[in-house]
Swiss-Prot record:
This is F-box/WD repeat-containing protein 9. Residues 16-26 have a biased composition (Acidic residues). GO terms for cellular component: cytosol. The keyword Methyltransferase does not apply. WD repeats lie at residues 171-210, 220-261, 264-301, 305-342, 344-381, 387-424, 427-458. It comes from the Eukaryota. The gene is FBXW9. It holds the Pfam family F-box-like. It comes from Homo sapiens (Human). Residues 76-123 form the F-box domain. PANTHER family: F-BOX_WD REPEAT-CONTAINING PROTEIN 9 (PTHR19855:SF34), WD40 REPEAT PROTEIN 12, 37 (PTHR19855). InterPro entries: F-box-like_dom_sf, F-box_dom, G-protein_beta_WD-40_rep, WD40/YVTN_repeat-like_dom_sf, WD40_repeat_CS, WD40_repeat_dom_sf, WD40_rpt. Keywords: Acetylation, Phosphoprotein, Repeat, Ubl conjugation pathway, WD repeat.
Length: 458
């Protein structure tokens, strides 16, 4: 799929031009949505897989610059009398953290040797054996990237042989469609079609008490929401949940999960983004709405940016990015209060993960797409087939790791290279919805009424 570049001169003011939404049954609306949006391509209508775009990427080659020789000459025989190339070869067998944080403190000569960014670039490219990163960055932190890559490869070595797996099947009585890790992976929230948001203590996994489920948010007499819980987002110790009942509820984890606010949206809330100064919702009635969570929360602005439901969104201090069933990706400039770009796609995006300047997204055809933020404009640079045969429902990207989930009943673990290298695939009895990774925990929601958890080596 080749996606055209969006223009960066769409300066229309972000004013409300919404149409009123008629009253509908949220359960019937949700079921119709799932059947339409998350179902696999129909037989005989298979989508063509795109050839990768020709944007150049970094790759290990013969022309790669050699690490600078900075080891001072010594008169006495010993380790430092070895050639720099041999010292670097020895270092390649040591953990990257040890080399960077311990070996560099031994002496000035070793500090100079391991402080050269070319040293770390060569080491990273040898580890991944593919072009990396997918989007070139001028001031890329090669030591940090190398540490993250090596940790990821070590944790999932031998097809994830050393990874602990837990299936938390008691707590929900319907499909789990949203997950969120908190406090470095110590706690987890899960939202389900049973209308509840559950709080889990993942520190109790594998213990004798096994008291993993802490509580269900809300009052005991009622469920958390009156409709399916479809989205979760957090800002520090505060959490919000979005539902097909057209509400967003706010919860304070520092106060034992007590509710401290509620927003009545115009339609079913399908996606959320929570920042210190704004809370953004994407709804079934095609709107993107901004609230100030510090005041009320108070409605700031809203607009119908799309012609179909808003399926995924994210925000930072400069942009609000939304993807819709209408096959568009819209970028709003927060500071100029205007639409910056409107990209027309050949498929619709279901999930996104952003670490500037890379935006990774999964679509309804089972494909991954990478957009680069270049001087404020997002450009599609690569499209990948990573083996998913059905829609990609969850994605999480970081500089050293990439996770994807799909209704094809798999979670796939990748290295974020060009193309991504899949190092582990775990299959399940039902479709997987959303994925979240933090610390040494990875979680995914399952259509099998369970929360799936993988605990990695610390």
């Amino acid at each position: 799929m080749e996606l055209p570049l969006g223009r960066c001169d769409d300066s229309r003011t972000w004013d409300d031009d919404s149409d009123p939404e008629s009253e509908t049954d949220p359960d019937a609306q949700a079921k119709a949505y799932v059947a339409r949006v998350l179902s696999p391509p129909k037989s005989g209508l298979a989508f063509s897989r795109p050839s990768q775009l020709s944007t150049p990427a970094a790759s290990p080659s013969a022309s790669e610059p050699r690490a600078a020789s900075r080891v001072s000459a010594v008169s006495e025989p010993g380790l430092l009398s070895l050639p720099p190339e041999l010292l670097l070869e020895i270092c390649s067998y040591l953990d990257a953290r040890l080399v960077l944080h311990v070996l560099s403190r031994v002496c000035h000569a070793l500090r100079d040797l391991v402080s050269d960014h070319v040293t770390w670039r060569l080491r990273a490219l040898r580890r991944v054996r593919a072009p990396y990163p997918v989007v070139e960055e001028k001031n890329f932190d090669w030591p940090a990237a190398c540490i993250a890559l090596e940790q990821h490869l070590s944790r999932w070595a031998e097809d994830g042989r050393w990874v602990e797996y837990f299936c938390l099947a008691e707590g929900h009585v319907a499909s789990v469609d949203s997950v969120l890790l908190l406090q470095g992976g110590s706690l987890c929230l899960s939202g389900s079609r049973d209308r509840n948001v559950n709080l889990w203590d993942l520190r109790q996994l594998g213990t004798e008490s096994n008291q993993v489920l802490i509580k269900t948010l809300g009052t005991k007499r009622n469920s958390t929401h009156e409709g399916w819980v479809w989205s979760l987002a957090a800002q520090d110790h505060r959490v919000c949940s979005g539902s097909w009942d057209s509400t967003v509820k706010l919860w304070d984890m520092a106060a034992d999960g007590q509710q401290f606010g509620e927003i009545k949206a115009s339609s079913a809330v399908l996606c959320l983004s929570y920042l210190p100064d704004i809370l953004v919702t994407g709804t079934y009635d095609k709107k993107v709405t901004i609230y100030d969570p510090r005041a009320g929360p108070a409605l700031l602005k809203h607009q119908q940016l799309h012609s179909r439901p808003v399926l995924t969104l994210l925000a930072d201090d400069r942009h609000i990015i939304s993807g819709s069933e209408d096959h568009t990706l819209v970028v709003v400039d927060r500071r100029a209060n205007s639409v910056l770009q409107r990209l027309q796609l050949d498929s619709y995006l279901l999930c996104m993960s952003y670490q500037e300047p890379q935006l990774w997204a999964g679509d309804n055809q089972g494909l991954l797409h990478v957009f680069a933020n270049r001087n404020g404009c997002f450009q599609l640079i690569r499209s990948f087939d990573v083996g998913h045969s059905f829609p990609i429902t969850g994605i999480q990207y970081s500089v050293g790791a990439l996770y994807t989930t799909s209704t094809d009943k798999t979670i796939r673990v990748h290295v974020p290279t060009d193309p991504p290298r899949t190092i582990c695939t775990r299959r399940h009895d039902n479709g997987l919805n959303r994925v979240c990774a933090e610390g040494n925990l990875v979680v995914a929601g399952s259509g099998d009424l369970s929360l799936e958890v993988w605990r990695l080596q610390a």
